[in-house]
């Protein structure tokens, strides 16, 4: 349907895991009544860290508040095909729908909304709805995340530091998003633009390395000689001397080229 401008009087926010205490257990432990055991269990979970290519893939966000906006924006950055399910939405989400950046289904969630989707994210203050989205996604073997409720997630969203082509993910296994945000800020200050520029310059040399150096080990040594070289390419870039880094790469190419 066509998106309609609507200023919501209440923006749903995600429910913390504590909201499930005393309710029927919905996690993999199936304890009957929730006692929060699974929250502690999440800290022991060996998560498989991966980067997903979302370009053109359908991603569903349920919930039109500030948290939903945050998740929608994260998916759009990665070129996801985003559908928002919410009877009301934050004004910024409304604008994204009006400009065609997302599809807004302005109504309550329905089970069929997940058909054909890769990812579902529930960002509402309705515990029963969050559980329903989780169960529907699990039945479809989909990736699903109920914001701030780790037991109702089969993947968690790390805090991301993005600088050019670089992306650094910080995860606390759902234990403390606040700590992850602090780490994100500090890592962003430490690994700034010079690292992004170096990544671009090294990527420019990848074609030469693949065409010229016969083995993986040869290519590994070539790139490590630049990254860990003397002078330090990061320090050169901090001084604004990208040309000196290009010279380092050219010197390494001459040194590693087969005779």
Regions found by a protein language model. Give the residues of each.
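Extreme N-terminal basic, low-complexity initiation segments
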Residues: 1-15
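Cysteine-centered motifs
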Residues: 25-27, 34, 38
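Hydrophobic, well-ordered beta-alpha structural blocks that scaffold small-molecule cofactor pockets
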Residues: 38-88, 93-96
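Residue-level detector of alpha-helix initiation sites
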Residues: 66-67, 127-128, 174
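Glycine-rich, highly charged phosphate/nucleotide-binding loops
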Residues: 97-115
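ADP-ribose/adenylate-binding Rossmann-like module
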Residues: 119-124, 130-157
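E1/E1-like adenylate-forming module used to activate ubiquitin-like modifiers
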Residues: 125, 146-196
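An accessory alpha-helical subdomain
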Residues: 174-259
